[in-house]
Amino acid sequence: MAHVTSVTLGEHLTGFVGEMIQSGRYGNISEVLRDALRLMEAREQRVQHVRDMVLAGTNVPVSHRLMDEIFSAAVKDTSV
């Protein structure tokens, strides 16, 4: 369900939104803002995924192998 909201944009963002509409990429301000919010939501989901992976990694024992050894092993594992 749509919700009417009022936003205040500075000159720079107002100009940018206008350029996006003039380019024909978007039909109106609402389309620009919806796309921007979808991109922001996707970025936040990626950031949260990375945070979750980091937290999961804190429970893994520390490896004393050098990075070169780890990379070499990874290359061998993926060689066909």
UniProtKB/Swiss-Prot annotation:
Key words, A-Z: Plasmid, Toxin-antitoxin system
One Pfam family in the UniProt entry: ParD_antitoxin
A GO molecular-function descriptor: toxin sequestering activity
A biological process from GO: regulation of DNA-templated transcription
Coiled coil residues, start to end: none
Signal peptide: none
PANTHER family reported in the protein's UniProt record: ANTITOXIN PARD (PTHR36582:SF2)
NCBIfam families xrefs: antidote_CC2985
Family listed: Belongs to the ParD antitoxin family.
Function according to Swiss-Prot or TrEMBL: Antitoxin component of a type II toxin-antitoxin (TA) system. Neutralizes the effect of toxin ParE.
Name under which the protein is recorded: Antitoxin ParD
Organism: Yersinia pestis
Lineage: Bacteria, Pseudomonadati, Pseudomonadota, Gammaproteobacteria, Enterobacterales
Gene (UniProt): parD
